Amino acid sequence: MDNGMLSRFIMTQTLLVFCISMTLSSHFGFSQMPTSSVQDETNDNITIFTRILDGLLDGYDNRLRPGLGERITQVRTDIYVTSFGPVSDTEMEYTIDVFFRQSWKDERLRFKGPMQRLPLNNLLASKIWTPDTFFHNGKKSIAHNMTTPNKLLRLEDDGTLLYTMRLTISAECPMQLEDFPMDAHACPLKFGSYAYPNSEVVYVWTNGSTKSVVVAEDGSRLNQYHLMGQTVGTENISTSTGEYTIMTAHFHLKRKIGYFVIQTYLPCIMTVILSQVSFWLNRESVPARTVFGVTTVLTMTTLSISARNSLPKVAYATAMDWFIAVCYAFVFSALIEFATVNYFTKRGWAWDGKKALEAAKIKKKERELILNKSTNAFTTGKLTHPPNIPKEQPPAGTANAPTVSIKASEEKTAESKKTYNSISKIDKMSRIVFPILFGTFNLVYWATYLNREPVIKGATSPK
């Protein structure tokens, strides 16, 4: 009885273990089936796309443009600016870092598959036809290759291709500097096909004239300019090889004036004011006024030279040149004014001394006449002399005293005519005229240039 119960218990345990093992094995078997099926499906997709690409490139000639002999190839373009600047005034160029996008349709690359878009490796770009785009006003362009070539290529199932690359471009920016430093410029970026005329390849903007060129919010790298906006357009040029379309994007810049106010304008204004301090010094202070005049002239010369160092050597005068020239004229005029005052001061002293000497001579003659009359009256009178005094000898102090007193009075009169610490009439006028003229000039200058809208040739202003 005990043996039977024991055998039943063992059989029950064995059956239970068998059921559990079967359950576990069946569970793990079903859980692995989807994984293997997904892997098989992935491998199948890779195989399909590999066959698609091999089939697309089989017999493909990248030397021929799409639609050759049938239609004009249309290339749609747009630009995303990641970094704008710096701008060089001396070289008249600017640097820009962009994502340059081009899109076109190539019917030879149509495919049918489980996906509508194929993201492709950049190596495939060398095996298919791509537009021969070049930048007309580019001085130097760099295609980034770190860590791999910064290029993107996508293929739609209808044969539409998107080709994007990252470029750093140094381009020419013609500048008209007549209004410098209150000037504005439109720096162009021009590109188009190098070999294909309009009869074969045409370029159009992808998103119209408003959103085809976009600048990142933190993309400005400008210290002396404000980036006011950008506009796009197209140009057509005719050459001996045909008519070509040029895509143009203008970046509108407005110069910041703060740096030049601190470095040039304020020093010039202070130098002119300093030169006018000499009008308030005595005209006899020749050394002090000479130092004022010469120092301010040399200072203005130094400022004019340093102001030109940050500009290209243009043949015309800028707004800053006119300001410096007028300030230089005021400073130089102050020096000439002092020379004039000094000249007339010395001449006035000489003229006053001459008049004093002539007046002294006239008085001397009058006194001699009076003295002669008194002497004659004294000699003709009936005077009795002591016996011990001869008659020929005049009384003591009557003959030499008038002569000595006349000479002393002449010298005192001549010296008294030289009035020191006096104010020249020219200085009085200069104290009023010079500040008024300089203040009027500043009002006219700043009102003219700050309120005038700069004219930019060859570009429309951004809206």
UniProtKB/Swiss-Prot annotation:
It comes from the Eukaryota. Residues 1-25 form the signal peptide. Keywords: Cell membrane, Chloride, Chloride channel, Disulfide bond, Glycoprotein, Ion channel, Ion transport, Isopeptide bond, Ligand-gated ion channel, Membrane, Postsynaptic cell membrane, Receptor, Signal, Synapse, Transmembrane, Transmembrane helix, Transport, Ubl conjugation. The chain crosses the membrane at residues 261-281, 287-308, 319-340, 429-449. It is found in: Postsynaptic cell membrane; Cell membrane. It is a multi-pass membrane protein. Residues 26-260 are extracellular. Expressed in brain, in hippocampal pyramidal neurons. Disulfide bonds join C173-C187. The keyword Aminoacyl-tRNA synthetase does not apply. Residues 387-408 are annotated as: Disordered. There is a cross-link at K355 (Glycyl lysine isopeptide (Lys-Gly) (interchain with G-Cter in ubiquitin)). GO terms for molecular function: GABA receptor binding; GABA-A receptor activity; GABA-gated chloride ion channel activity; ligand-gated monoatomic ion channel activity involved in regulation of presynaptic membrane potential; transmitter-gated monoatomic ion channel activity involved in regulation of postsynaptic membrane potential. GABAARs subunits share a common topological structure: a peptide sequence made up of a long extracellular N-terminal, four transmembrane domains, intracellular or cytoplasmic domain located between the third and the fourth transmembrane domains. Belongs to the ligand-gated ion channel (TC 1.A.9) family. Gamma-aminobutyric acid receptor (TC 1.A.9.5) subfamily. GABRA5 sub-subfamily. This is Gamma-aminobutyric acid receptor subunit alpha-5. It comes from Mus musculus (Mouse). The gene is Gabra5.
